[in-house]
Amino acid sequence: MKKDPKDTKVVIGMSGGVDSSVAALKLKEQGYDVIGIFMKNWDEPDEYGYCTAAEDYEDVRRVCEQIGIPYYTVNFEKEYWEKVFQYFLDEYKKGRTPNPDVMCNKEIKFKAFLEHALKLGADYLATGHYAQVDYKDGEYRLLRGVDSNKDQTYFLNTLGQYQLSKAMFPIGHIDKKKVREMALAHDLVTAKKKDSTGICFIGERNFKEFLSQYLPAQPGEMRDLSGNVKGKHDGLMYHTLGQRKGLGIGGSGSGEPWFVVSKDLKNNILYVVQGEDHPSLYTYGLLATDLHWVSEKEIPQTFTCTAKFRYRQPDQNVTVQLTGGDTCKVLFDGPQKAVTPGQAVVFYNGEACLGGGIIDETIKTVQEL
């Protein structure tokens, strides 16, 4: 079992945000030997020449000095570029909508960074994620954070037994409001800092402008399912399934808004439908690849559980059928809207995250089931 806290070295990944600040504070209060480390994964100021990494590191430095723990920075720009950003671009080239946060946790935080922490002699790697780990029936389990609105197990679904045996999530059992209150009570400089949103390497920048720096946009036609041209799109990569905003199509026809329903990569056509309950927006199942399970015990060929197809979505009842290798078919109990290839599908049994995969394609008709 765990050693005495004072003899236990914990490296905590610090982002300059309030969550990792309070996580570090909690570890220090519990008596652990804590080292704060800031990961530099991206080296590029925004279009105004402003580098948020410099400000974030300054916040890490000030918090660590307030708490009284040593702090360092480590550079994973090369690994991040190769493992996360290239994947991000490749998925967009395929007309899909990737989730770089899942890949960052898999390849950077709980791989490259974990290895770095262990080389420093750490017993554990801690982060400010809203998630929990426990040990039951001879295995580690990944459990949802108690703050259901902030739970981040969706992004941590690729963690296995080894990673969980080394992971600590000090604020997983606290809700966000309490985290802010703790930061304020200790006068941490990050107490009132707003939460970061969106994709980390884009930050507050315009997504379209950012992506166009790396992938040439190919404008094309927007059509309805009958083939009628409804407008122009700036590039398929700028659109995701179920999208309503930014299409620039007036409410012609029934007057209802238009939604993205599919992409024809070969002919560079964006297909749209009218009305938020249009049948074509719904799917009945999906095929997933790159499956990963938290448990190392044998998984049944067919089982029922709940799943999320996007972050913060309420759990949906599904039946999972393993189809060999790292693939599966997921059948929905009821039709689901805007399930998007490239995103993660993550499975749950009650509070436990079972694992997940990448949505490869959707099943559009009952006949395909």
Curated annotation (Swiss-Prot):
Residues binding ATP, per UniProt: G13, M14, S15, G16, G17, V18, D19, S20, M39, G128
Catalytic activity: S-sulfanyl-L-cysteinyl-[protein] + uridine(34) in tRNA + AH2 + ATP = 2-thiouridine(34) in tRNA + L-cysteinyl-[protein] + A + AMP + diphosphate + H(+)
Disulfide bonds: C104-C200
Record Gene3D superfamilies: Adenine nucleotide alpha hydrolases-like domains (2.30.30.280), HUPs (3.40.50.620), Translation factors (2.40.30.10)
Keyword ATP-binding: yes
Active site: C104 (nucleophile), C200 (cysteine persulfide intermediate)
Localization annotation: Cytoplasm
Enzyme class, first EC level, given as a word: transferase
Main location: cytoplasm
Keywords, in A-Z order: ATP-binding, Cytoplasm, Disulfide bond, Nucleotide-binding, RNA-binding, Transferase, tRNA processing, tRNA-binding
Residue numbers marked as site, Interaction with tRNA: H129, Q343
Family of this protein: Belongs to the MnmA/TRMU family.
The protein's name: tRNA-specific 2-thiouridylase MnmA
Organism, scientific name: Alkaliphilus metalliredigens (strain QYMF)
Species lineage: Bacteria, Bacillati, Bacillota, Clostridia, Peptostreptococcales
Gene: mnmA
